[in-house]
Amino acid sequence: MFNYYRKEIEWGGRPLVLETGKIARQADGAVVVTYGDTVVLCTAVGARSVKPGQDFFPLTVNYQEKAFAAGKIPGGFFKREGRPSEIEVLNSRLIDRPIRPLFPENFRNEVQVVATVLSHDLENDPAIAALIGCSAALTLSGIPFFGPVAACRVGYADGAYILNPTLPEMKESALDLVVAGTSEGVLMVESEASELSEDVMLGAVTFGHEAFQAVIDAIISLAEHAAKAPWDLAEPSAEEIALKQRIDTLGRAAIAEAYQERVKQQRYKKVGAAKEAVLAALATEGLDVTAAKPILKDLEADVVRSAVLDTGYRIDGRDLKTVRPIVSEVGILPRAHGSALFTRGETQALVVATLGTAQDEQVIDALEGEYRTNFMLHYNFPPYSVGECGRMGSPGRREIGHGKLAWRAIHPLLPGKDTFPYTMRIVSEITESNGSSSMATVCGTSLALMDAGVPLKRPVAGIAMGLIKEDRGFAVLSDILGDEDHLGDMDFKVAGTESGITALQMDIKITSITPEIMKIALGQARDGRLHILGEMSKALTEGRSDVSSTAPKITTISVPKEKIRDVIGQGGKVIREIVEYSGAKIDINDDGTIMIAASSEDQATRAIERIRGIVAEPELGAIYTGKVVKTADFGAFVNFLGARDGLVHISELAQGRVAKTTDVVNQGDVVKVKVLGFDDRGKVKLSMRVVDQQTGADITESVGERPGRPAR
C-alpha cells in the first residue's frame, strides 16, 4: 500500500531522518523530517499550467505550528489555531528565501510549499527541520527546482562554533545564525550576534555551509529512490527569441537614457514612458504585447547591471562604495518619550520610542512555552512612502520580517531589567523609501531609544549591500537603492556598532555566492557602518541622562519575601488600595522586588511610604501617628504602621483614670502612640498616656510609667 523510503544520518550529535511515501501521498512531494523528537511534515504541490497573463512566479510558503506538537491546547474562545503567529511568518520567510532563487528564471506555474510541525521536543528547532524537509519535498516532486538546498543553525560560545545548538544551549551562545545553501555555495544567512567581528561571522557561515553538506547528500540519496519524473520545460520558441531581439533593438537605448535621471520619481516616469513606447511599437507590428512585458523587465535589468559593471557608477551617480547623504534629528515629537527622524537619500524613517512598565510587556505563547518580552519593534511601510496608493491594514509578512531584523540588530545592546526596568516599544514609520528602509529603521531606533533616555551600550547602525555578478566580473554596492535591490543579485543587510556585528541578513537571487564576495561585502559594509555612525553622532552619541518628563518614573524597592503577601493582601485588596491611594502602577516580583511607576514624584512617594509602612516592623519605644479604627470597653485599636494595628489599653489612654474609652477617643481620631512592647502572640501594646498629643513628644519621665497589675 505504501511506497515507503527512509534515509537516516547522524548530524550534530543526533539522528536526522527523512521519510517519504507514507503521509500526504497526493502531494507532488511529501517528506517527514525527524530531528531528535521534533517532527515536521513538508509538502510541495505545483500547478501543471500557467494562468493566462501570469508574469511573475507565484510561490507560496506556509510554515505552521500545531499546538498538539507540544502537548498543548490553543487558547482563546475557539480553542483552535488561528492567524499565523509572528514566528510562523518569520519561519515561512526563512524557508521561502533560499528556495525561491532555485526555480527556473521563466517558470510561472503556481507552487505551494507547506511545512507543518507535528511534534516539538523543546530542544531541536523545527525551523531547520522544516527548511530541509521543504527542500527535499521539492527535490522529489518533479517540479523544476535546481536544488537540493539545506540549512543549519550555528552558535558560538567559548571561541568555538556549535552545530545546531539546542534551545537551552542557545541561551549561552553569543551567536544565533541560520545559513542555507546548495553544495556550491550560500544562498541565505539570518543572524543575531553579540557584537562579533566580520571574521567570526564569515567563519560561522563557512562552518555552517560545510556542516550541511551531509544533509544535501542525504536528500540526493532519497531522491535516487523516490523522486518523480521531472516536468518538461518548454524551450524558448523562435518567435520568443525574435521578440526578445526586437525589444532589445527598440528599447535598450531609450531605457538607458531614462536611467540617466537621478531623481527616483522622475526616473520612474521616464523609464515607464520608454517601456510604453516599446509596447506601442510592438502593437503596431502585431507582436504579442503580453509576452513582451517580462522581456522588457529583463532588458531593464541588463541595462542597469551592464552600466554598473562597465562604468563603476550607479543609477544616482555614486561610485560603488559611497553612502547617500544622511540627516539625523532627535526629539522632534514633543509628547513622545523619544523620537528620531533618520533620512538617508530618498529613504526616511520616523521612529518613536515609548516607555512603559512591566504590565506593558508582551506575552508570547509559543510551543516552547509562554514567555514575556520587554522590547517590541513594529515596522510600518505605508504606500505613500513610495508615492503609491495601496492597502492599509494589519502588517504583512515583509513588514514583520523587516521589524524582526531591526529588533535583532538592537536587542544585544539593550540594558538589563535590573538597571533599566522599563518596557520599550518602538514604532518605525517609513515615510519615504528608496531602498534599505529596514536599515534606516535600525539607525532611527538607536537614536530614538537614546533620546528616550535608554542607556544603550553603544549606538547601532545598519547598511544594505548589493551585488551585480556576471561572467565577466562582479561589483559589490554599498547602501543600495530600491532599483539596485530589485535588479541586482544580492540583498545583504549588516547592522552593528563600532565594536562588531549585531545582525546580518543575506538573500541571494542567483544560485550561490563565493566566500570571496562575502568577505568583500562584509569589509565594505563595515566601512559604511562606521561612516553612518559618525553621521548619527552629530545628533546624539549616548542615551540622555534621564527619561522624558512625559514617561513614567520607575522606582525599585525590595521587601522581604515573607512580606509580599502583606503588600498584596487577601484577594489583592491591599495592593489595589495602594494603587488607588497613590495613582501609581505597581508590579511585584516573586523575589520581593517591587517596581513603582508614577507620573510624578508625589505619586511615587505616596506608594513607597504606604508599602514601607506595611512591611516595617514596629520599633520598641518609637512614637507613631495612627488612626483609631475601633473602640472597646478595654481600650482602643489604633492603625499606626501601614496595615498594622495595636491596642491602647484603657489605662494607657490618658494620665488620669478613664471610666469609658469613648470619653478620650472615638473611631476615626488621629492620635500619637508609643510602642510599649509585644505580648506573647506578637500583638503590639501602645500608649497615648506617655505621648504629648500636641507635639508628639515622649513625656514618660514627667508622668511616670504605669505600675504593673498585681498578680492574682
From Swiss-Prot:
Q: InterPro entries per the record?
A: ExoRNase_PH_dom1 (IPR001247), ExoRNase_PH_dom2 (IPR015847), ExoRNase_PH_dom2_sf (IPR036345), KH_dom (IPR004087), KH_dom_type_1 (IPR004088), KH_dom_type_1_sf (IPR036612), NA-bd_OB-fold (IPR012340), PNPase (IPR012162)
Enzyme class per UniProt:
transferase
The family database entries (Gene3D superfamilies) matched by this protein are listed as: GHMP Kinase, N-terminal domain, K Homology domain, type 1, Nucleic acid-binding proteins
Q: Which cysteines are joined by disulfide bonds?
A: none
- The record places domain S1 motif at 621-689
Gene Ontology CC, one term: cytosol
One BP annotation, GO: RNA processing
Functional note: Involved in mRNA degradation. Catalyzes the phosphorolysis of single-stranded polyribonucleotides processively in the 3'- to 5'-direction.
The record's listing under PANTHER family reads: POLYRIBONUCLEOTIDE NUCLEOTIDYLTRANSFERASE (PTHR11252), POLYRIBONUCLEOTIDE NUCLEOTIDYLTRANSFERASE 1, MITOCHONDRIAL (PTHR11252:SF0)
Protein name as catalogued: Polyribonucleotide nucleotidyltransferase
